[in-house]
């Protein structure tokens, strides 16, 4: 690696660490709270504002819904006793990054055991816009704002924050901005080493609250409207201004002390197994940990009778979590009991090996977004989170005749070498029941993919293990009311099926017989696991049969912004190569069982009818025996239709 490149990479790494607080605090200081710690977040959204010569002007978008304002935080949000459990939970950088963010409110907790022993408690933050800091409800400091009151707007930025010395718009705030140190310096605002006096502290839980207030956009954006450093971004913009960076954003925050005397750090996970609450709509990451100052609340599940109702609790440890066992007891309301057997426990793990480099969650943090029915023998610790994290999902199948009201119970969490944790569970059953899943009025149509399962889990197509996975996936689809079964009669469609579900057997006289064994077993599984289908879609046509009117050669050139190559050209060229060929199907040799792919005559060829009509006659008979003949339809997973001759 040459020296200049090495220095460039090091400079980028140091900038990232200082910008987002992922690495260090003050020399020899104890880190009490950090950017990647546990924060509660509230956002107020409004249209962005530009400062013109005649005053402030809201920047309206082309979408009315985008301009709707959201509610401000409650007036007492800075007080220590404010209930923030319903606010977004995450690192300080998990907040929305948008020009529409008008006010950003954040709360974090830390424990003080003896205020008199706390030494050199200091706060530093970097932000865009203006900032007000509160400790236990008392204002500590503010920056780039009016000295008093609750300002709606922070100090304006100079032109250098928006345009380079050559008059061109600056790029979005990513690593490209390293080329523009003047612009970076103009944007970043800081409150550095602000001392927190002991008189603001109290024994027990203390609350640090931060409000970030937006600044207006400079009038130079009006002079440069319909211009952008990123031309691709300009093509997708819904307003004439380049709003490529946000004037209301917290970039970095650290609370440090001279040592740990008199307080307990809340910037990293504790040494023991820990549990914390997480909303089911909030993603969980391997870097997450719980708030030491917050006792886990009950896991709450709310929903109707006969419905599937979920909640979750997350556990974490600085080491691998081994022998994880979760036991849910019966749920009771007086004499009414919902048995524990109605509760399914699942365990979230990363899907594949993807990791995030987002500064919101820490480098290489992975989202825990795939559910396992049984726990791993060992949930490994990861470098990103310096430990292991396991979200535990509780899903209740509420009885159809469940008595409405509040049921209570508890879940016990055990792990090898750890003290067992007990978390209360509260289930609120509404005064109505939903229909069975196949009677939902909401139309749900998911396409089950046998080939995806075979490839993802490396199992042979149509093996017993494969059929078990198909049954599981159909069971999941049935639980949300999916009601369409797709039967590909042709192979190699853009839905990903390598084979057709009906095998074609060529007879000595040139006609065909058909092997329905795969289709029959697939329909058996669908009826058993998903429910009676409302439609059975037989797929007999595919986009590769649509031949371009003239020869197309793949150039490899870019056709659409943000595309890496000429995708449309690649598709058309591939279809040109298949010109004259009919639909691909899977053929089977009845003597050997060997499979092969053959092309039948095109549908506009009269010979095709002699092959397909007998097939559909038999399909009608077989579906009639199942009582499903009225569900039969022709289907296509394509935006392109067959031509008149093919129909």
List PLM regions with ranges.
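Contiguous beta-strand segments within globular domains
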Residues: 120-122, 294-319, 391
């Amino acid at each position: 690696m040459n020296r200049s490149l090495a220095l460039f990479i090091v400079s980028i790494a140091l900038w990232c660490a200082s910008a987002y607080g992922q690495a260090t605090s003050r020399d020899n200081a104890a880190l009490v709270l950090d950017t990647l710690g546990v924060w509660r977040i509230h956002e107020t959204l409004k249209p962005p504002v530009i400062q013109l010569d005649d005053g402030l002007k809201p920047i309206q978008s082309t979408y009315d819904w985008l301009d709707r304002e959201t509610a401000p935080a409650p007036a007492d949000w800075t007080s220590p006793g404010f209930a923030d459990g319903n606010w977004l939970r995450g690192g300080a950088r998990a907040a929305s990054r948008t020009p529409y963010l008008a006010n950003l409110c954040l709360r974090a907790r830390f424990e003080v055991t003896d205020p008199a022993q706390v030494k050199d408690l200091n706060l530093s933050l970097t932000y865009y816009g203006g900032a007000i800091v509160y400790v236990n409800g008392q204002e500590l400091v503010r920056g780039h704002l009016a000295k008093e009151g609750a300002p709606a707007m922070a100090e304006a930025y100079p032109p250098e924050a928006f345009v380079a010395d050559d008059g061109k718009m600056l790029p979005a705030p990513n690593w490209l901005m390293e080329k523009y140190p003047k612009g970076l310096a103009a944007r970043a605002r800081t409150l550095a080493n602000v001392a927190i006096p002991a008189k603001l502290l109290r024994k027990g839980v203390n609350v640090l609250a931060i409000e970030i207030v937006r600044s207006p956009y400079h009038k130079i954006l009006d002079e440069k409207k319909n211009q952008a450093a990123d031309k691709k971004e300009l093509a997708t913009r819904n307003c004439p201004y380049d709003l490529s960076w946000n004037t209301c954003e917290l970039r970095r925050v650290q609370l440090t002390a001279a040592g740990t005397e008199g307080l307990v750090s809340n910037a990293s996970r504790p040494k023991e197994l820990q549990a914390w609450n997480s909303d089911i709509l909030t993603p969980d990451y391997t870097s997450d940990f719980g708030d030491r100052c917050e006792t886990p609340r009950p896991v709450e599940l709310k929903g109707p009778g006969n419905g599937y109702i979920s909640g979750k609790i997350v556990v974490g440890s600085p080491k691998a979590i081994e022998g994880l066992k979760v036991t849910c007891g019966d749920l009771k309301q007086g004499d009414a009991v919902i048995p524990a057997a109605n509760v399914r426990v699942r365990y979230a793990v990363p899907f594949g090996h993807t990791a995030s480099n987002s500064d919101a969650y820490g480098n290489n943090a992975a989202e825990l977004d795939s559910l396992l029915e049984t726990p791993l023998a060992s949930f490994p610790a990861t470098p990103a989170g310096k430990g292991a994290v396991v979200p535990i999902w509780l899903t209740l199948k509420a009885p159809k005749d469940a008595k409405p009201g509040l049921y209570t119970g508890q879940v016990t969490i055990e792990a090898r070498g750890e003290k067992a944790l007990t978390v209360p569970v509260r289930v609120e059953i509404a005064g109505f029941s939903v229909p069975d899943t196949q009677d939902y009025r909401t139309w749900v149509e998911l396409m089950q993919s046998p080939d995806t399962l075979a490839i993802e889990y490396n199992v042979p197509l149509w093996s017993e293990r494969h059929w078990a996975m198909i049954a599981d996936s159909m069971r999941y689809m049935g639980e949300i009311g999916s009601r369409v079964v797709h039967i590909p009669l042709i192979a190699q469609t853009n839905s990903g099926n390598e084979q057709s579900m009906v095998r074609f057997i060529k007879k000595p006289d040139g006609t065909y017989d058909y092997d329905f064994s795969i289709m029959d077993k697939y329909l058996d599984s669908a009826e058993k696991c998903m429910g009676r289908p409302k439609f059975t879609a037989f797929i007999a046509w595919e986009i590769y049969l649509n031949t371009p009117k003239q020869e197309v050669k793949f150039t490899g050139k870019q056709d659409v912004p943000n595309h890496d190559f000429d995708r449309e050209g690649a598709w058309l060229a591939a279809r040109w190569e298949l010109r004259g060929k009919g639909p691909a199907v899977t053929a089977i040799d009845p003597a050997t069982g060997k499979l092969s792919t053959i092309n039948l005559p095109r549908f506009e060829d009269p010979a095709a009818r002699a092959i397909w009509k007998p097939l559909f006659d038999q399909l009608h008979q077989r579906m009639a025996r199942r009582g499903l003949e009225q569900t039969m339809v022709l289907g296509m997973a394509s935006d392109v239709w067959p031509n008149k001759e093919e129909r």
